[in-house]
Design a protein with these regions (language model features):
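Alpha-helix initiation and N-capping motif
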Residues: 53, 86, 105, 119, ...
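N-terminal Rossmann-like or analogous alpha/beta NTP/dinucleotide-binding catalytic cores
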Residues: 1-116, 199-200, 204-217
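Catalytic adenosine-cofactor/nucleotide-binding cores of aminoacyl-tRNA synthetases and other
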Residues: 45, 104, 203-204, 214-292
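Short, basic, helix/turn surface patches
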Residues: 60-71, 124-134, 251-254
């Protein structure tokens, strides 16, 4: 059975870009008569905002989206909150070839959050180090192999992670599990078959496929959809409060009007306000055209 998911982080108000990705992931699940799962990626505790998770649920419900499993309603693979799953990540980590790394916090401070920008390659400083003067992170020993995969939107992608990123962190030196490992473990455990997410995460995919291979598991199908940008072409971020769903709701826009606007932002020929279920055929045409 098709199993898709939307996995937001509770670090602020959901903006238009998040909403469009959620809409597309929901449409993909419903077009395929599958399950739509909500998972909360809250490992970055320093940036987590109180009440953000509940606001995400309210925004999704207001938009007209429903889900079959999630952190609010539970399901077969609960808990659906990453901060409640550390023992699972620790268990999976023992199955990987790893080594401790005591490089400075500056080198590793961003690995808990999903990465959105190009990261510098790690030089392997601690690969052969046997003693450490301070607390250590845990790095996955990346093999020198080329990873090739076909993305449902972006086409064929190839990358040698050892050449581009090097050995990457799976646990930070403060004990927090990193995005790459947690994401893969959760998708495996929740039996996710298809991952539709923003193109800002395309660069994470080869690393995640390496982890799937290390676990002798089959990766899901990936679809990295275009990001919604502002008039300057910049990716929308949660700091753009004027574009948050909460603010738009308070301004008086209706969910059907916003759904129409999101559809139009994808180039879909939708003129009237509509419910998400009215876009199923549009999504079929769009995803087929995107896959070429």
């Amino acid at each position: 059975m098709f199993r898709g998911r939307f996995a937001p982080s509770p670090t602020g108000e959901m903006h238009l870009g998040n909403a469009r990705t959620a809409l597309l992931a929901w449409l993909q699940a419903r077009v395929n008569n599958g399950k739509f799962i909500l998972r909360l990626e809250d490992l970055d505790t320093a940036r987590t905002r109180q009440g953000a998770a509940d606001q995400i649920l309210r925004d999704l419900e207001w938009l007209g989206l429903d889900w079959d499993e999630g952190w609010d309603i539970g399901g077969e693979f609960e808990p659906y909150i990453q901060s409640e799953r550390p023992d699972l990540y620790a268990n999976y980590a023992t199955r990987l070839e790893t080594y401790p790394c005591s490089c400075s916090r500056k080198d590793i401070q961003n690995v808990v959050s999903a990465p959105h920008n190009t990261e510098p390659r790690y030089a392997g400083t601690c690969r052969t180090r046997t003693t450490h003067a301070r607390a250590t992170a845990l790095r996955f020993r990346v093999p020198d192999v080329e990873i090739a995969f076909t993305d449902g939107v972006c086409g064929t992608i190839t990358e040698n992670v050892q050449n581009t990123i090097g050995d990457f962190v799976i646990r930070r030196n403060d004990g927090a599990w990193a995005y790459q490992l947690a994401c893969v473990v959760d998708d495996l455990e929740m039996q996710i078959t298809d991952v539709l997410r923003g193109q800002d995460l395309l660069g994470s995919t080869a690393r995640q496929i390496l982890l799937y291979k290390a676990f002798n598991a089959k990766p899901p199908r990936f679809y990295h959809v275009p990001l919604l940008t502002d008039f300057q072409g910049k990716r929308l971020a949660k700091r753009d409060h004027a574009l948050s769903i909460k603010t738009l709701r308070q301004s008086g826009i209706s969910p059907s009007e916003l759904t129409r606007d999101l559809a139009q932002s994808l180039g879909w020929k939708i003129n009237a306000a509509c419910h998400p279920k009215d876009l199923l055929e549009c999504f079929k045409i769009w995803i087929q055209a995107s896959s070429g």
